């Protein structure tokens, strides 16, 4: 993350793009949500590479431009890489991300679904936390062990085991397939 140092009016006095923990001048991060006036283009040279975080923000701070931070009371989760995204979903399912709840209806303790999920929960082995997206079909005899997220419009066949995995939308997991700590991108058939 970029790190900002602000005064008591939240005016940014310095900006560091991705410093090490030891080099960071504060614990206030820049999360990448910006509102600029059109005059910002006066500070950006044309015809060359110019990075907002590495070039523009330090320049604005140096110039003493009216450059402000807005403190927000929420947890920012970086999902720039697949392992980060996977961990973010697990963290939400486990209830570890402030102010973010699992969407849908809780059909069993720790098991949430979107609309129109076709599942006979009495004949499915499931232990949460689990989220199942809308329009998904889960056949009798399937096993789902959390933390697991199954996207919308999926089909989980009889005897399939989904354990600590993420399955994106429109995926089909065949009979007897075992997925343990797997990520299945959307529109795939497994097994």
Predicted regions and their residues:
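Left-handed beta-helix
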Residues: 39, 46-191
């Amino acid at each position: 993350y970029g790190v900002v140092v602000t005064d008591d009016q939240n005016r940014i006095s310095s900006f560091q793009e991705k410093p090490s923990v030891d080099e960071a001048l504060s614990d206030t991060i820049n999360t990448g949500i910006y509102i600029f006036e059109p005059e910002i283009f006066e500070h950006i040279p044309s015809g060359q590479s110019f990075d907002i975080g590495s070039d523009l923000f330090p320049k604005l701070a140096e110039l003493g431009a009216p450059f402000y931070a807005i403190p927000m009371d929420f947890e920012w989760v970086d999902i720039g890489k697949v392992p980060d995204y996977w961990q973010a979903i697990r963290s939400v399912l486990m209830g570890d991300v402030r102010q973010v709840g699992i969407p849908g209806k809780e059909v069993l303790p720790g098991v949430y679904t979107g609309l129109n999920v076709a599942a006979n929960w009495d004949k499915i082995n499931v232990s949460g936390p689990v989220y199942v997206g809308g329009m998904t079909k889960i056949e009798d005899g399937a096993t789902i062990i959390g933390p697991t997220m199954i996207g919308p419009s999926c089909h989980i066949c009889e005897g399939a085991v989904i354990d600590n995995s993420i399955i994106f939308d429109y995926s089909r997991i065949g009979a007897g397939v075992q997925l343990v700590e797997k990520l299945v991108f959307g529109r795939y058939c497994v097994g």
